[in-house]
Each structure stands twice: as structure tokens, then as C-alpha cells.
């Protein structure tokens, strides 16, 4: 599967030191230029993991052109989210968009763009046997400052219990 990511899920993976999950789940990982800039500006303990992933397997790609209807749907989003959604839509083959921000997810759904967030990616990793349990990772990433709502965590608990 080809993945296009916004900044947030990549920062979450860096906080967990789990970029290898993304590398193993995706055939290719792309980010737009604005997401690249946001990742390069990240400091702290996860900066080295981000830098390694950028050099090893994450590719930068410029999004395609946008029509006025799409522009209206993307209005109000930050530039990284806009570019990530546009980049995901520019591929001719199916692409999974990694995006955790609620407003961005709402816009992507309006455009019928398949998407998941960090929790969904961790659930997929569990499904294919790359990790045993999702909940400790969710708790760990939240403890390290990655914001996930209680509702999202509750949904992950339900989904993980069914797997």
C-alpha cells in the first residue's frame, strides 16, 4: 500500500520509535514539502528518528493541481494538511492518507479519500502480527505528549478487543 502522511502521525511514530512499522506496512511513503518542513523543524528526543526516516524511506513529492471544489473543502486547514490531502489525491493508484487532525479527516472524507491515523496504523500493525498489543503504545504516545482524544482511545480499545 502507498501511504501519504501528514506531520502528526509521523511525529507519533517517532515518539514511539516505531517507524519500522510504517516501513513494513507501506510499499512507499510520501510526504508533501510543507510536511517535510514541519518535520525538519521538530526538535526533542524524536528528531533523530524523524531524520533517519526522512533519509531512509520517506519520499518528498509535490502535490498535483487542485480544482475549486476541492479548494473550498480544504479551506481552513493548515498548509501541511492541505498538501497531504492533495498529494494523496494526485496518485492514480489507491493511496492511504495518514492524518489525525479532526478537521483534516473531515475534509478528506468529503473527498472520499481513504485514511487512517496513528491509532489505525497501530491496529493494522497488530492485525498483521507486527505488534502484540496496541493499547500500551497508545498510552505511551499520549504520555509523551501526542494528543489523542479520550473518544479515540476508547474506540481503539473496542477495536483492539475485537481483533
Region roles according to the model:
Residues 105:
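Active-site-adjacent loops and short helices of periplasmic peptidoglycan-processing enzymes
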Residues 125-131:
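Short, flexible loop segments at boundaries between secondary-structure elements
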Residues 116:
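Conserved, well-ordered active-site substructure
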Amino acid at each position: 500500500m502507498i501511504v501519504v502522511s501528514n506531520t502528526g502521525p509521523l511525529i507519533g511514530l517517532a515518539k514511539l520509535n516505531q517507524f519500522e512499522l510504517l516501513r513494513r506496512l507501506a510499499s512507499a511513503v510520501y510526504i508533501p514539502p510543507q510536511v517535510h518542513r514541519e518535520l525538519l523543524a521538530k526538535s526533542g528526543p524524536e528528531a533523530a528518528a524523524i531524520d533517519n526516516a526522512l533519509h531512509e524511506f520517506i519520499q518528498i513529492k509535490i502535490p498535483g493541481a487542485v480544482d475549486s471544489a476541492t479548494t473550498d473543502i480544504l479551506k481552513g486547514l493548515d498548509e501541511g494538511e492541505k498538501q497531504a490531502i492533495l498529494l494523496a489525491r494526485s496518485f492514480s493508484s489507491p493511496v492511504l492518507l495518514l492524518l489525525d487532525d479532526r478537521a483534516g479527516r473531515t475534509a478528506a472524507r468529503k473527498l472520499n479519500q481513504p485514511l487512517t491515523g496513528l491509532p489505525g496504523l497501530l491496529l493494522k500493525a497488530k492485525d498483521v502480527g507486527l505488534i502484540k498489543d496496541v493499547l500500551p503504545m497508545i498510552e505511551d504516545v499520549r504520555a509523551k505528549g501526542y494528543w489523542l482524544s479520550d473518544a479515540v482511545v476508547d474506540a481503539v480499545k473496542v477495536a483492539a478487543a475485537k481483533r
